[in-house]
Structure formats: C-alpha cells, structure tokens
Amino acid sequence: MIQPQTLLNVADNSGARKLMCIRVIGAAGNQRYARIGDVIVAVIKDALPQMPLERSEVIRAVIVRTCKEFKCEDGIIIRYDDNAAVIIDQKGNPKGTRVFGAIAEELRGLNFTKIVSLAPEVL
C-alpha cells in the first residue's frame, strides 16, 4: 500500500532511480492508498546525470510492485521485496524503453499492456 511520502524504486530506464509519492490519483474511488495498477503523482528524489528526467521533477507513475501482499483472482497471494513504479506520460505510455523486474499480471487488464510487453517476467 502506497500513500503520500512513500519512497519507491523506479523499475524502468527513464533515468530516475527513486520516487516519492505525493498524491494517489488512480485508485478506485477516493482511496487513501495506492495498490498495484494505480496511478500516482510523484517527485523524483534521485536521478542519473545527463538524462531527460531531473531531480525534483513532478511526474506520473503506475505502481508495479508493492511490499504489501495482494490476492490474485485465482487465490494466489503475491508479495514483492520492494515498492516500485514505472514512469508514464499523460496518455499512459511508459517513458522508458525497458522495464526491470517482475510485473503483476493485473496490469494487463488495466490497459497498461505496453508496460507488460516490456517486462521480462509477468506474475
């Protein structure tokens, strides 16, 4: 569960390394926490030099991994080692060209098929 002030890793090669959530905007209804597949507004806390994204830039991101376990539709419980997000643009397309780490299958049903196709492993 991601809430404002939560630090997240970046799971793509867009140039950012760490994000801090400042607002949950894509959750169902008016919820306080973001789960896998929800869109957040975040600020970049750490970035690589000479990359298009810079530190203290406000961006949108979709949550792809959380430490809080969640239950799949088939009854399997999945929990990841870290909180991670992929940076997206206003249309929902990823800014990076690669995605690192495992991605949840639930993103496919939420119209993030481009992120799922870039992922090396889908759980």
Curated annotation (Swiss-Prot):
User: What SMART domains does the record tag this protein with?
Assistant: Ribosomal_L14
Q: Which NCBIfam families match?
A: rplN_bact
Question: What keywords tag this UniProt record?
Answer: Chloroplast, Plastid, Ribonucleoprotein, Ribosomal protein, RNA-binding, rRNA-binding
What GO terms fall under cellular component here? chloroplast; cytosolic large ribosomal subunit
**Protein localization:** Plastid, Chloroplast
Q: What is this protein called?
A: Large ribosomal subunit protein uL14c
Is Glycoprotein among the key words of this record? no
Family classification: Belongs to the universal ribosomal protein uL14 family.
GO molecular function terms attached to this record: large ribosomal subunit rRNA binding; structural constituent of ribosome
Please give the function described in this protein's UniProt entry.
Binds to 23S rRNA.
Question: Which InterPro entries does the entry mention?
Answer: Ribosomal_uL14 (IPR000218), Ribosomal_uL14_bac-type (IPR005745), Ribosomal_uL14_CS (IPR019972), Ribosomal_uL14_sf (IPR036853)
Q: Name one GO biological process term.
A: translation
According to the record's subunit comment, the protein's assembly and interactions are: Part of the 50S ribosomal subunit.
Principal localisation = plastid
